[in-house]
Amino acid sequence: SKAAVKHHAALPYSEMPEFMAALRNREGIAAKALEFTILTVARSGEVRGMTWGEVDLEAKLWTVPGDRMKASEEHVVPLSPAALSVLQAVHEAGLKPDDVVFPAPRGGSLSDMTLSAVLKRMGLKVTVHGMRSSYRDWAGDTTAFPRDVVEMALAHTVGSATERAYRRGRALDKRRKLMEAWAAYCDGKATSK
């Protein structure tokens, strides 16, 4: 039954531009990590464990190794200009490839409660994971992107391994356009169909 599925409280996507504007005004690494998580529609653990070695700023790609992914398959994330500017804001000289991108104040990775705490402090009763639903609803309601491209951004496994490998290669440009459209929407530059 559908009731058995655990639904994470999501922000209606119509409220996303206003929320993102408020989030960008907040200080601290956790707010930056949350902003990046929303822009890339990644899972919070993927962002919290992210290292600089996974990022290719020139190619504008973030490659999450399979051992850090829920489905154990490497996940390539096209980075929108907005996502890149978050990375530029936290980048410092002398960082090594295995340095965490969003380090906890005392070193190491941020805890899973840190990003949720930002939402709580902002007075929202939504979950970090629910932001992925906001993206999915937005994509389904307002864009013409194919469903498998929308799902691929969420690293949901659709189809056989061979099919997925084929589609991954084909879909990167579409996914880049999708991530750029999502970032533009989050920034209040929405052009709905």
Task: Describe every region a protein language model picked out.
Residues 17-31, 40, 77, 85, ...:
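Short, basic (Lys/Arg/His-rich) helix/loop patches that form interaction surfaces
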Residues 1-3, 120, 162-163:
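Short glycine/proline-rich turn/loop motifs
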Residues 1-50, 58, 64, 69-73, ...:
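Basic, Lys/Arg- and aromatic-enriched nucleic-acid-binding interface segment
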Residues 6-10, 37, 73, 77, ...:
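Hydrophobic alpha-helical scaffolding
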Residues 10, 63-72, 84, 144, ...:
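Catalytic-site neighborhood detector that most strongly recognizes the C-terminal catalytic loop/helix
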Residues 57-59, 81:
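Residue-level signal for tight coil/turn positions that link beta-strands
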